[in-house]
Design a protein with these regions (language model features):
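C-terminal active-site/capping subdomain that shapes the small-molecule cofactor and substrate pocket
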Residues: 57, 293-399, 404, 409-416
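Short catalytic-loop micro-motif centered on adjacent basic/acidic residues
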Residues: 149-151, 175-178, 201-204, 232
């Protein structure tokens, strides 16, 4: 297969995209990036036939977890810029749990990114901006043959996000938008990505079992069981830089919209703004990267009798979303392979809080599974092999000795 990433200036998909790896660049090397990188190493030898917590599939559409390769990373923190990615994920204010051993030298140097509004009033108290000029983002993405760019910029980085999106479009990469700046759900940007022949999965990454997905599920349960939801709240506290940054309430507008819509879109009736409160509450340093979510729902049941529900959820915040990102970048890669452009309807609805189209999670998952099956790299290889004869067909199906169904050589399961 070709090693080009098929930049939009040359091709918008098809055979040029169908190499064996998913080449990923990261914008923002914080706790979420750390969990993402750790997750690739933790599950690199996972059995494709086994279910892994937090992943739709170990092998998604022909791409194993280990098929994700990091090509570039960008940050503005003086404690991270210039370091190898394998060191930067443990540097600065990063404080997530260490659940996997990551080599110190991954061969990826963290480049100086663009600041714009990425460093807010509170973050600037803890993070010192690296000196020097912004790196040539477009040139780096092209030179490294990057397929997909993942954004982990801080909440409230409106200008910075849109600046990076312009670089991504010019470089010809797919985009996974993990933050609450609205790109995929906006017609303007959706049209821009379609015109460029590039896919986007967004906006605002869900967690495996996070406050929003739990809140959505409970709100949907009330609806399905005929309980009228009258009031609801979600209060979150944590000890990472995300929560510290969100002490600056002016940066929270899109975050509150994203989390609120994710819940209210599922209840089946309109709710007054004063009856719904969803958002971050406070920063508690000793929680580190842990997050506590306090959720309450108040409703009316049979006979107009009150029915109230309250729970507390405790999670490690960043690993909770890492598996979702692993699925998102692989879906984005499948779209690149086949020239599917614009926001990806199923994957965005299932994996993100603020997609272009909201829908119940079970429907969104089914749509995503259909997307994976339709654009599977295995399916494409099988069709090619069928045209070439029985031997090639056996190779593509994984029936040839020592070959997996995704066409790669078999490998014994090793240490996670």
């Amino acid at each position: 297969m070709s090693t080009t990433n098929g930049h939009a200036a040359h091709t918008n998909g098809g055979p040029a995209r169908q190499q064996e790896k998913v080449r990923v660049a990261i914008v923002g090397v914080g706790n979420c990036a750390s969990a993402f990188v750790q997750g690739i190493h933790y599950y690199r030898d996972a059995d494709p036939e086994q279910q892994v917590p937090g992943l739709m599939h170990v092998d998604l559409g022909g791409y194993h977890v280990r098929d994700i390769e990091f090509t570039a990373a960008f940050d503005i923190d003086v404690e991270k810029v210039g370091k190898d990615l394998g060191q930067a994920i443990w540097s600065g204010q990063n404080n997530t749990i260490r659940f996997a051993e990551v080599p110190e030298h991954l061969g990826i140097t963290v480049h100086r990114g663009m600041t714009h509004d990425g460093l807010g009033k509170y973050l600037s108290q803890r993070i010192t901006k690296a000196p020097g000029e912004t790196a040539d983002i477009v040139g780096i993405l092209r030179d490294t043959h990057t397929d997909v760019v993942v954004s982990y910029l801080p909440v409230g980085s409106e200008q910075a996000t849109k600046w990076y999106v312009e670089q991504i479009l010019e470089a010809g990469c797919g985009f996974v938008n993990c933050i609450t700046v609205f790109i995929a759900r906006e017609d303007y940007w959706n049209k821009r990505f379609k015109k460029a022949g590039l896919p986007i999965v967004g906006d605002d990454i869900k967690s495996q079992v996070g406050a929003t997905i739990v809140h959505r599920t409970l709100a949907r349960l009330f609806y399905d069981r005929g309980v009228e939801l009258e009031r609801t709240s979600q209060l979150n506290v944590g000890g990472n830089m995300d929560f510290f940054n969100m002490l600056e309430r002016e940066r929270l507008e899109s975050k509150k919209i994203s989390k609120t819509n994710a819940v209210t879109s599922i209840v089946g009736h309109a709710m007054e703004a004063d009856d719904v409160h969803v958002g971050p509450s406070d920063y508690v340093p000793w929680l580190t990267d842990r997050k506590w979510a306090h959720i309450r729902l108040e409703g009316q049941a049979f006979g107009d009798v009150p029915l109230n529900l309250e729970l507390k959820l405790e999670v490690w915040d960043s690993p909770n979303s890492a598996g979702i990102v692993i699925d998102a970048v692989r879906c984005c890669k499948l779209a690149l392979n086949h020239g599917v452009a614009g926001q990806l309807d199923g994957p965005s609805s299932y994996l993100m809080k603020s997609p272009y189209k909201q829908r119940p999670d079970d429907i969104a998952r089914a749509d995503t599974e259909r997307f994976i099956e339709r654009y599977s790299a295995r399916t494409a290889r099988a069709k090619t092999a069928a045209a070439k004869g029985p031997a090639a067909k056996a190779l593509a199906s994984g029936k040839a000795p020592g070959v997996r169904a995704d066409g790669a050589k078999g490998r014994a399961k090793g240490k996670k």
